[in-house]
From Swiss-Prot:
Induction: Induced by follicle stimulating hormone. Induced by isoproterenol-mediated myocardial fibrosis. GO terms for cellular component: cytoplasm; cytosol; mitochondrion; nucleus; plasma membrane. Residues 134-143 have a biased composition (Acidic residues). InterPro entries: TSC22/Bun, TSC22/BUN_CS. Residues 217-241 have a biased composition (Basic residues). Keywords: Cell membrane, Cytoplasm, Membrane, Mitochondrion, Nucleus, Phosphoprotein, Repressor, Transcription, Transcription regulation. It comes from Rattus norvegicus (Rat). SUPFAM superfamilies: Delta-sleep-inducing peptide immunoreactive peptide (SSF58026). Residues 983-1004 are annotated as: Leucine-zipper. The gene is Tsc22d1. Residues 22-111, 126-285, 445-479, 511-531, 581-609, 720-740, 795-847, 879-919, 1015-1050 are annotated as: Disordered. This is TSC22 domain family protein 1. Coiled coil: none annotated. PROSITE patterns: TSC22 (PS01289). The lineage of its organism: Eukaryota, Metazoa, Chordata, Craniata, Vertebrata. Transcriptional repressor. Acts on the C-type natriuretic peptide (CNP) promoter. Acts to promote CASP3-mediated apoptosis. Positively regulates TGF-beta signaling by interacting with SMAD7 which inhibits binding of SMAD7 to TGFBR1, preventing recruitment of SMURF ubiquitin ligases to TGFBR1 and inhibiting SMURF-mediated ubiquitination and degradation of TGFBR1. Contributes to enhancement of TGF-beta signaling by binding to and modulating the transcription activator activity of SMAD4.
Length: 1050
């Protein structure tokens, strides 16, 4: 279902999206083929995975798995075409290309197959066959790459663990993540992330899937397949990453597209390579990204779906596929993903719902669709799956040799990274984180798969990866944002007209979003945004509500609401300008206009904004994906929310909803629609559950964030600083209130949501802050913004708001969804610029960085002061988000990274960000990027300071890890072989001895007289030793035989 839309979207989206989509679709196909349900995803994933992994990683396990995957692949080919011609295409293309690399890389992976996972997994795999198979694959991959992949993805996945839990999901997630990774390595990140996330969520999501079903529904399917595939995908992805992305390509194809697209563009095929990193990021974020994608996917199902697909298609795709498929699962995950991505498991995990989780993905994570679908998202099913919390444990248990495919290619060097064992610190955290992640990821989820990831991240991206991915994506988003930033900046100028500013921001966000979509992050963002947008649009009513809010806001000046709406809507409205850009937007646009209308007060501003937006669009032009993205964002967003919600829902049912709900106020308007599904389900919990929220938040944030951001943005600068502080307090304070407040202040809520989204924990805090701030602020744009900011800071979403409010939101969302969150913030900060640029480069953090600069400017204004706080907050948030989002990726490492990283990041980031903010927007951007890149890496990156460095550092780190893993593998293998040899020799000796004894015994028996024998027997029975000689001889033989038996047996 998705597919078609996807296709359409893809088509619309364009090759990129196409590719992206493809990926997604591929996933679908994957899903179809791979697991039937998962198969599509799987297919893609599997295809990718299968293909690549098959030969490579999974050879053994692979074989088991692979077959299905391959089937998936095959199927993929065939399957996709129908539904996903695009996908197929992409996949094919990707597949083809990447595949080869995949193979190569994969081979590498194959090298170490050891993985505990394998057997069990395989069994499971087999058991699930698709799912499991995929899972297995993942696992296999895990073993091999997968481990790594899984790690990444699993991270997402695992992170999401859910994946494991899901088993299927896990596979999915992992696989997805992997696949995604591969696929989306770039996109993968998303995808994986998202998917990852979603995957985990997947299962959860599935129900949600339904929710999303409408949107997510497909996801659901997707979700499943996706998941499978996702896993596969992931796997593939991972491979891809590893392989390059070859796998990626395959699955990645699409995902890559998105990322790849971006990446592709950048890397093009590279997808494997370069993009991979982003992918990785994506991957990491992947989940998230995935999620994102997922989200998109979910979107796809819906209009958004298409949009999403379109916009973020690739990412989305993946996500969608993964996320979409997954995402939905993931969706929350990010699944939608969120997360990946957030949610999606993020996408949601984000992407979870975010992507899936958010739709997760996301963040994983990552991202969800599936999850989304499944979860909500299933979304991000993969991601989400990853996010699936349960799995985390399992995953955790897995040895995660994770391949951090964050930057897959980059890490080509060492493909293995044992990221963390995933032991799931994630498990617990993962789950939560996952949730978040998912949300984030799902909003990323990554794969997790995040997707946050694997997002490696996914989610980490998966997490790291995911995160990275997410980051990347986010960054991408950022890029988009960046693009927006320009606008923003401009807007900032217009800031005075805060509304416009806000709007601008919103736009930016939107743009950002759009770009987001481009980027995975973007996608995620997009998703988020889209979702929101879509939501907004979809929800025209919501929209209206938003408008109301807008009005409210408007009064406030924040308009954020409007923005929110506007942002979403507005954005949409603005988007209208962009509208053109965003096709999907069209639909939205209409709503948007309404929004605009509501905006009227703001309108002018809006107009400006709109006009600006055009600028943005222009900027976006670069981000042109943006438009598409934008839609997608809407779509995405929507999905994301869904996913997210879903994811959340799956994950935290509440959360999803909460987010939604919270956002509901606004987002609801916006998100609602999407969330409605997802959210709705979750709404109640949502708030509570940050996770869902995150995604939602993401979505919402985008809306809310946007709104808030938007409105705030202008203010932000001013408010920013204080807000930051404020926010924090607020955040903390308002934890409870937030929900109410959130609702209350739609914008606020939204922001809150964003905030909440950020991290469940955070979220609350975030929420609180945001709310508080928001609440207070709502009236005041600044306040809001601040809150948003605070939120942003606190939360990714918040971050989003913060940086771009909108952007950030978006980003945040994305971020939320995935690492993105982290990213987001940074992204936002940077992203805006990034986005514009990134479109192509997006992948490249670098670019983003660059872009970011501008953004930074804007951001700086806004974030500047805030940035720092933001940073810190961001970091926290980000970390959080990332952790969450990243969780996929991070997730694996999140605790570590998150905890440690977070802090580090916080401080570092803060500093870095600050610094960056201050002077180096770029730096900041870089930092941000870095963040995004990998939260973990972030830290490192922070050090690096440059986006690039971030990427590089991440890569370096990944490489090192991979190398270490390889070493470990080698040693392990040697050790095992030696042990085996020794045992064999011992057995031989025992056998010889035994035979000797037997002979001796026979001889003795022969020689002995019956009497003696009888006597001996009696003695033996009594235990009295007969003649020493005889007994011994006699006795020994028996003993020996026993030994022998055991020996032989052994």
């Amino acid at each position: 279902m998705h597919q078609p839309p996807e296709s359409t979207a893809a088509a619309a989206a364009a090759a990129d999206i196409s590719a992206r989509k493809m990926a997604h679709p591929a996933m679908f196909p994957r899903r179809g083929s791979g697991g039937g349900s998962a198969s599509a995803l799987s297919a893609a994933g599997t295809g990718v995975s299968g293909a690549a992994p098959s030969s490579e990683d999974f050879p053994p396990p692979s074989s088991l798995l692979q077959p299905p995957p391959p089937a998936a692949s095959s199927t993929q080919g065939p399957q996709p075409p129908p539904p996903q011609s695009l996908n197929l295409l992409s996949q094919a293309q990707l597949q083809g290309q990447p595949l080869a690399p995949g193979g190569t890389q994969m081979k590498k992976k194959s090298g170490f197959q050891i993985t505990s996972v394998t057997p069990a997994q395989i069994s499971a795999s087999i058991s699930s066959n698709n799912s499991i198979a995929e899972d297995t694959e993942s696992y296999d991959d895990l073993d091999e790459s997968h481990t790594e992949d899984l790690s990444s993805s699993e991270i997402l996945d695992v992170s999401l663990s859910r994946a494991t839990d899901l088993g299927e999901p896990e596979r999915s997630s992992s696989e997805e993540t992997l696949n995604n990774f591969q696929e989306a390595e770039t996109p993968g990140a998303v995808s994986p992330n998202q998917p990852h996330l979603p995957q985990p969520h997947l299962p959860h999501l599935p129900q949600q899937n339904v929710v999303i079903n409408g949107n997510a529904h497909p996801h659901h399917l997707h979700h499943h397949h996706h998941i499978h595939h996702g896993h596969h995908l992931h796997h593939g992805h991972h491979h891809s990453s590893h392989a390059a992305v070859a796998s990626t390509s395959v699955p990645g194809g699409p995902p890559p597209t998105s990322p790849v697209s971006r990446k592709l563009s950048t890397a093009g095929s590279s997808d494997g390579g370069v993009p991979v990193p982003p992918t990785s990021a994506v991957s990491s974020a992947g989940l998230p990204a995935s999620v994102m994608t997922s989200i998109r996917a979910p979107s796809t199902p819906g209009s958004i779906g298409v949009n999403s697909v379109t916009g973020t298609n690739a990412t989305n795709n993946v996500n969608i596929a993964a996320v979409g498929g997954f995402s939905p699962g993931v969706a929350n995950s990010v699944h939608p993903n969120a997360v990946s991505i957030s949610g999606g498991p993020g996408v949601t995990s984000g992407v979870n719902v975010n992507v899936l989780s958010g739709m997760g993905n996301g963040t994983i994570s990552s991202p969800v669709l599936n999850a989304a679908a499944g979860i909500t998202v299933g979304v991000v099913s993969s991601q989400q799956q990853q996010p699936q919390q349960p799995p985390p444990t399992v995953n955790t248990s897995r040895f995660r040799v994770v391949k951090l495919d964050s930057t897959s290619e980059p890490f080509k060097k060492g493909r293995w990274t044992c990221t963390e064992f995933y032991e799931r610190e994630n498990a617990v955290p993962g789950p939560e984180g996952v949730a978040i992640n998912k949300v984030v990821e799902t909003v990323k989820q990554t794969p997790t798969e995040a997707s946050s990831s694997e997002r490696e991240s996914t989610s980490g991206s998966s997490v790291s990866s995911s995160v990275s991915t997410l980051s990347h994506y986010t960054e991408s988003v950022g890029s988009g944002e960046m693009g927006a930033p320009t606008v923003v900046v401009q807007q900032q100028q217009p800031l005075p007209p805060a509304p416009p500013g806000l709007q601008g921001v919103a736009l930016q966000q939107l743009d950002f979003s759009s770009p987001g979509p481009q980027s995975i992050s973007q996608s995620q963002m997009s998703q988020v945004q889209l979702q929101p947008q879509e939501l907004s649009f979809q929800q025209k009513p919501n929209l209206q509500p938003v408008p109301l809010q807008a009005t409210m806001s408007a009064a406030t000046g924040i308009q954020p609401s409007p923005v929110n709406v506007v942002g979403v809507t507005s954005a949409v409205g603005q988007q209208p300008s962009i509208s053109s850009l965003a096709q999907p937007q069209l639909p939205y646009p209409q709503p948007a206009p309404p929004v605009q209308t509501p905006l009227p007060g703001a309108p002018p501003q809006q107009l400006q904004y709109g006009q600006q937006q055009p600028m943005v669009p222009t900027q976006i032009a670069p981000g042109h994906g943006q438009p598409a993205t934008q839609n997608p964002p809407s779509e995405y967003a929507q999905q994301q929310p869904i996913f997210q919600a879903a994811m959340s829902s799956g994950q935290s049912s509440s959360t999803g909803t909460g987010a939604s709900v919270i956002p509901v106020a606004q987002p609801q308007g916006i998100q609602l629609p999407v969330q409605p599904t997802a959210v709705q389900a979750q709404p109640a919990g949502a708030t509570g559950q940050p996770i869902g929220q995150a995604p939602t938040a993401v979505s919402t944030v985008p809306a809310g964030g946007q709104i808030a951001s938007i409105g705030q943005q202008a203010n932000i600068p001013t408010a920013v600083q204080p807000p930051s502080t404020q926010v924090t307090p607020s955040v903390v304070q308002q934890g409870a209130p937030p929900s109410s407040q959130v609702v209350l202040p739609a914008p606020t809520g939204i922001i809150h949501q964003g905030v909440q989204t950020s991290a469940p924990s955070l979220p609350q805090q975030l929420v609180i802050a945001p709310q508080s701030t928001m609440v207070a602020v709502p009236p005041q744009t600044q306040g809001v913004e601040a809150v948003a900011h605070g939120v942003v800071s606190h939360q990714l979403p918040t971050g989003s708001p913060l940086p771009s409010a909108s952007t950030i939101s978006v980003t945040s969302q994305v971020s939320s969804a995935g690492p993105s969150g982290m990213s987001s913030v940074p992204t936002n900060l940077v992203p805006p610029q990034n986005i514009a640029q990134p479109p192509a480069t997006q992948n490249g953090s670098l670019v983003q960085s660059v872009s970011q600069s501008p953004l930074i400017a804007t951001n700086i204004n806004l974030p500047l002061a805030q940035q720092i706080p933001l940073s810190s907050t961001q970091f926290s948030t980000q970390s959080l988000a990332q952790a969450i989002g990243s969780q996929m990726e991070d997730t694996r490492r999140p605790a570590e990274p998150s905890s440690g990283g977070l802090p580090q990041t916080l401080s570092g980031d803060s500093g870095g960000v600050s610094a960056v903010s201050d002077g180096s927007s770029s730096s900041l951007a870089a930092s941000a990027s870095l963040f995004p890149l990998k939260v973990l890496p972030l830290t490192t990156p922070l050090v690096d300071g440059e986006d690039e460095s971030s990427g590089a550092s991440v890569v370096a780190i990944d490489n090192k890890i991979e190398q270490a893993m390889d070493l470990v593998k080698s040693h392990l293998m040697y050790a095992v072989r030696e042990e085996v040899e020794v045992l064999k020799e011992q057995i031989k000796e025992l056998i010889e001895k035994n035979s000797q004894l037997e002979q001796e015994n026979n001889l003795l028996k022969t020689l002995a007289s019956p009497e003696q024998l009888a006597q001996f027997q009696a003695q033996l029975q009594t235990g009295s030793p007969p003649a020493t000689t005889q007994p011994q001889g006699t006795t020994q033989p028996p003993a020996q035989p026993a030994s022998q038996g055991s020996g032989s047996t052994a």
